[in-house]
Amino acid sequence: GWAGMSTHHCITLSVRDSAGLLDATAGMELGAPYAAPMAAHSYAQALQQAPRPLRIALVEQVGPWPTSSQSLEAVRQAARLCESLGHRVTSAQLPVVLPAFLDQVFTIIGASTRNYLDLLGQLRGTPVQPGELEARTRIILRDKGAVSGAQYAAAVEWIHAFGRQMALFMRDHDVILSPTLTREPAPIGELDLQDDSLRLDELIERFHSYSPFTALFNASGQPAMSVPLYWSANGLPMGAHFAARFGEDATLLALAAQLEQAQPWRQRVAPVNACVGGAFAPAT
């Protein structure tokens, strides 16, 4: 979906499980217009050997939104851990202007959403009504649901050009390291965005000021992962986000396995309760 920008994987407790599921699901869907190259070996095998020393680009901010001190400490601590494992970390800036990037992305999302809803209406025999949609979907359709074919094509070409820029950037780097979020994980309900009075630029501001890093790799097609290596003062995990070159998922998984061994996270549980035997019990 979204001209190739929407791809699914999983959230797992271990790198082993992530690699195993990728082994089970990897491969090109017949006739798909976009596909990553097939790996030479299984992803589970990639975990058996430490990665070669990697050139890691440390990116602390993208776009106009500041990164909080906690997020900066989380990513810098991850960088120090990588250096201790033999990798070389250097500061870098990504070749993207984020407001322009997001405008193109939402042009594609708006046109795609309009198309999906029209198809759904045809399948069920009645048009989809605005009241059946969430407010944020209505906001996107209001601003981007009637773009022209030329505007849609231009947005896709813009995203393709961005992918080429990122490929050039990756000639000098093996991996990009950034925060996953600009601040501590948001309280439940904060990102609800169910307010029809919001303009699209306000919706984008509210969400992408919180998470500006990850969408870039949906667009470039690069494999990426969030690894829990730091906990906030409130005991919440703050991810370090890593991205590799297009098709180099095995490099990321090997790095993740190395990080997991050096700084395990599976034993970390919520300070309030933990699920034991299907029931909730106090954590110890």
Predicted regions and their residues:
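A short helix-breaking turn/cap at a secondary-structure junction
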Residues: 1-78, 123, 263-284
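Short, well-ordered beta-strand elements within core beta-sheets of diverse protein domains
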Residues: 6-13, 143-145, 242-243
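Short, well-ordered beta-strand elements
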Residues: 10, 236-245, 252-253
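Short, surface-exposed loop/helix-turn segments at secondary-structure junctions
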Residues: 35, 103, 186-211
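Short helix-loop capping/hinge segments that flank enzyme active sites or metal/cofactor-binding pockets
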Residues: 45-60, 108-167, 179-184, 188-190, ...
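General small-molecule cofactor/ligand-binding pocket signal
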Residues: 88-95
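Small-aliphatic-rich amphipathic alpha-helix that forms the alpha element of a beta-alpha
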Residues: 167-168, 204-227
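Short, Asp-centered acidic motifs that coordinate Mg2+ and/or phosphate
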Residues: 174-175
